[in-house]
Amino acid sequence: MKMLLLLCLGLTLVCVHAEEASSTGRNFNVEKINGEWHTIILASDKREKIEDNGNFRLFLEQIHVLENSLVLKFHTVRDEECSELSMVADKTEKAGEYSVTYDGFNTFTIPKTDYDNFLMAHLINEKDGETFQLMGLYGREPDLSSDIKERFAQLCEEHGILRENIIDLSNANRCLQARE
């Protein structure tokens, strides 16, 4: 009986893991990321970019999937005022990679998502001969479990982003009142 329970637990873990996808993998279904999202955590190897009044402290509201692009709707806070910002990210030649011009040239991928709860994005910005990377954890709800947040922190470390450069925004003013 114990063996059967262990087998069931093992199969459950395999199934949960198998449901996750990466935009660079064959099993990624871009249509499933369509819809409403919330910025939960931002991380960067240039922390000032995501601190208060940083140009990349953007709060994702929605992803609208088109044939070869994504329309991204964000909010930003400047002097305690919320402003809406929309941008179009186009597919690049690389599988699962998108590009967008915003404060430089940006390319990004989605290294992990389960579609229903969370999405982890990895962005590289190039401007005036300098580059930095940014990672974002986004949720279908305004907050996520500590387990998912820890997995995101580990992914950031794998990309060379230190834990002190990870900012949990779940209690920050994310312009939730500005959502339609």
Swiss-Prot record:
Keywords: Allergen, Disulfide bond, Pheromone-binding, Secreted, Signal, Transport. PROSITE patterns: LIPOCALIN (PS00213). Residues 1-18 form the signal peptide. Abundant in the urine of adult male mice but absent from that of females. GO terms for molecular function: insulin receptor activity; odorant binding; pheromone binding; small molecule binding. The keyword Thylakoid does not apply. It is found in: Secreted. One of its GO terms (biological process) is negative regulation of gluconeogenesis. It comes from the Eukaryota. Disulfide bonds join C82-C175. GO terms for cellular component: cytosol; extracellular space; nucleus. PANTHER family: LIPOCALIN, MAJOR URINARY PROTEIN 1-RELATED. Belongs to the calycin superfamily. Lipocalin family. Binds pheromones that are released from drying urine of males. These pheromones affect the sexual behavior of females. There are about 15 group 1 MUP genes and their transcripts make up about 5% of male mouse liver RNA. This is Major urinary protein 6. It comes from Mus musculus (Mouse). The gene is Mup6.
